[in-house]
Amino acid sequence: MSKTVVRKNESLEDALRRFKRTVSKSGTLQESRKREFYEKPSVKRKKKSEAARKRKF
């Protein structure tokens, strides 16, 4: 869970920007999107092998 405290004399936009940066660095959004729907193990393996193939070329 990402937590951002608004500092003294800090605008809301700056605090929001810091919060978005911490969320993206922690990978929270990506993880939640990945777990949104159930994915069969066979589909996971297929995606993993396709990603490895893309990295190879």
Swiss-Prot record:
PANTHER family: MITOCHONDRIAL 28S RIBOSOMAL PROTEIN S21, SMALL RIBOSOMAL SUBUNIT PROTEIN BS21. GO terms for cellular component: ribonucleoprotein complex; ribosome. Residues 43-57 have a biased composition (Basic residues). The lineage of its organism: Bacteria, Bacillati, Bacillota, Bacilli, Bacillales. The keyword Isomerase does not apply. Residues 31-42 have a biased composition (Basic and acidic residues). InterPro entries: Ribosomal_bS21 (IPR001911), Ribosomal_bS21_CS (IPR018278), Ribosomal_bS21_sf (IPR038380). It comes from Listeria monocytogenes serovar 1/2a (strain ATCC BAA-679 / EGD-e). This is Small ribosomal subunit protein bS21. It comes from the Bacteria. Keywords: Ribonucleoprotein, Ribosomal protein. Residues 24-57 are annotated as: Disordered. One of its GO terms (molecular function) is structural constituent of ribosome. One of its GO terms (biological process) is translation. Belongs to the bacterial ribosomal protein bS21 family.
